[in-house]
Amino acid sequence: MFSKSEFREVVKSMGLVFGDIGTSPIYTLTVIFLLTRPTHTHIIGVLSLIIWTLIILVTVEYAWLAMSLGKKGEGGTIVLKEILVPLLKSSRNVAFVTLLAYIGTSFLMGDGVITPAISILSAVEGLRIIPQFENIGQSTIILISAAIAIALFSVQSKGIEKITWVFGPIMVLWFATIGFSGIASIFYTPEVLKAINPYYAIRFLLDNGIIGFFVLSEVILCATGGEALYADMGHLGREPILKAWRFVFLALVLNYLGQGAFLIRNPGSTNFLFEMINQQANILYIPFLLLSVVATIIASQAMISGMFSIVYQGITTRIIPMLKIDYTSGVFKSQIYISTVNWLLLVSVLFMMLIFKESSKLAAAYGLAVTGTMSITGIMMTSIFYHRKNITKALISLFITFIDVVFLLSNSYKIPHGGYWSVIIALFILSLILIYTSGQKKLYKLMKLMKSKDFLEKYKQVYATQNKIMGTALFFTRDIERIPQYISHVMFKNNIIYENNIFISIIKSDSPFGIETSFTKEPAKGLKILEIRAGYMEIVNVEKILKDQGIGEKTIFYGVEDIFTKNIIWRIFSIIKKVSPSFVQFYKLPTDELHGVMTRFEM
């Protein structure tokens, strides 16, 4: 049994991790049987495919294999890259793995656009089961769904930590409801239980050939959100998520079996979950519909928070441009809000709703990004286990990667039917990452960085002979061994020397969390070096660190790059740099003390 604290953590993970996969029963079977006839044999075969997809891709790939590869408790695609890169000897392999991580991140973010759209639309479409609303137009459904999405995204800037405590209990109620509903339906058609045998899944694929192969592209919808188990491991811990998954898995399997049993009895049904609930307890249908809408909102909220987290991780690992970040909680430092991401997501979600109009059509675009992410996770896991000489797990991981790729290939047919949208979104994000990272490397090479030894020689000479300004000046530098051009301009070209000069270097460590601050030895009179070593998931409050160190700065200098180029790619990079907040804006340093020093670069 659980202790009280363990129980609370398990319930909490229900609300923050399992919203997406938990609301999949609303639309998964309904969409599958648009592709294939609901005969008795087909229903049993599809149910078997769903059960074994949940076992292989979620339980084995994520709950067992991926979650055994955490780094200081943190999970996700970037973490897999951080684990794998030190194991590789070839720089070519490192570049390939880095590209894979970028593609995986892009797919994950592309998938995030579709999740709220399909979840909210599918729940609101349940209104049609109510007799008074059976003729409600699709435009009204879209309007209601859009209003819910707008309301959800509009409250993000206020912070949602005050209400997140209710997410867990609501999702526990959701899973209990769909689980018991499934049991009630199975009671009347117990033969569906034979779908637990994988023989029926294999037989369905063999009997149906190419159609069976394409059905896999919709079966994968039952596992969307499975990647959240690993991605959210750092926030909630491995054990609570695994314990919660046992309950969630049971509820999902029971509900899918129940829907299959209902479909055997009612082959003319079109919206299986809602019609099953309505038939079982008509008086409770409206409360259930409201519960389903709230569950999809919770699923969407988890995606939004996850997106903020992924983008922040990308910013701190320098693969995504800096964006304005607000902290929405004085208690939970991980509660952040990124306005650019929030409003771009809302526009994208509304666009998806307007373009596809129905959840069943939106399913045509869903799954491609998910299977892409799963395949990349499988490849990286297999490589890690192989390099660690864990041959058993490497072979199991290789088999699962093969299954992932089969699902990915089955989703290729979706590309001309709307799947191209998820590809376009992922390619846009990937292009942004590649242009930004390549531009930063190119820019760094163009910088006339001064070796520390040469700088100190000149500094000592200038400091001894020049008049000094009273007070303390701060200078930011990435590498204390190679001094940026702007510092040389300030001190040697403009002859601006303060009594006390402090170089601040913020170094991102390989670990996700932890902040260490220390002054290194004083290299010269009037010059100190402050190193801030922070985990790549840490939110660094530089102003607080300066106060804690007793630094009363008078002026903060920072470099500004002015890029001149005729190359179209570098022009895009230049625009990205111009619209992105500067280093000092990102860290929210006091504006009245800031002095930007511009240096022009021709790329």
Curated annotation (Swiss-Prot):
Keyword Transport attached: yes
Keywords: Cell membrane, Ion transport, Membrane, Potassium, Potassium transport, Symport, Transmembrane, Transmembrane helix, Transport
Major subcellular location class: membrane
GO CC annotations, alphabetized: plasma membrane
Catalytic activities: K(+)(in) + H(+)(in) = K(+)(out) + H(+)(out)
Residue ranges crossing the lipid bilayer per the database entry: 15-35, 43-63, 94-114, 135-155, 163-183, 209-229, 244-264, 283-303, 336-356, 365-385, 390-410, 415-435
Annotated InterPro entries: K+_transporter, K_trans_C, K_trans_N, Kup
A Pfam family assignment: K_trans
Family to which the UniProt record says this protein belongs: Belongs to the HAK/KUP transporter (TC 2.A.72) family.
Name listed for the protein in its UniProt record: Probable potassium transport system protein Kup
Gene responsible for this protein: kup
